[in-house]
Amino acid sequence: MTERIPPELQTQLVKLQQLQDQLNRLLTEKNVIDSELREVNKILQELSQLPAGTTVYKIVGNLLVKTDKETVQKELDDRKEILELRSRTYQKQENLLRTQLEDLQKKVNELLAKYYPQSGGAIKA
């Protein structure tokens, strides 16, 4: 005979799973942003080694467009600023989610101890 999970515990477990899923999605998005930021920094480093007024090419869709170094550098500096802001925002969200997860894990552990005292009632995320 299987034992039913108490509704209160079941609700908290669902919330815990949702928070974990949300954190995983956020970390994936943050990794994409951080990867793009590293790429932009690398390109800016390469551009800094070129003399002023140098002609460079950039890819726009399926086209290779001729432009000057300063224009590309300005575009990349703007992009870098946006990416850094997004990365900081994701970091704050990650910290908040991790705190919420810890709090909810404690609550779930308390409920497990309440409903299943013989098993010790602790889980790890």
From Swiss-Prot:
GO terms for biological process: chaperone-mediated protein complex assembly; protein folding. One of its GO terms (cellular component) is cytoplasm. The keyword Nucleus does not apply. GO terms for molecular function: protein-folding chaperone binding; unfolded protein binding. Keywords: Chaperone, Cytoplasm. It is found in: Cytoplasm. It comes from the Archaea. Its main location: cytoplasm. InterPro entries: PFD_beta-like, PfdB, Prefoldin. Coiled coil: none annotated. Belongs to the prefoldin subunit beta family. HAMAP family: PfdB (MF_00307). Molecular chaperone capable of stabilizing a range of proteins. Seems to fulfill an ATP-independent, HSP70-like function in archaeal de novo protein folding. Heterohexamer of two alpha and four beta subunits. This is Prefoldin subunit beta. The lineage of its organism: Archaea, Thermoproteota, Thermoprotei, Sulfolobales, Sulfolobaceae.
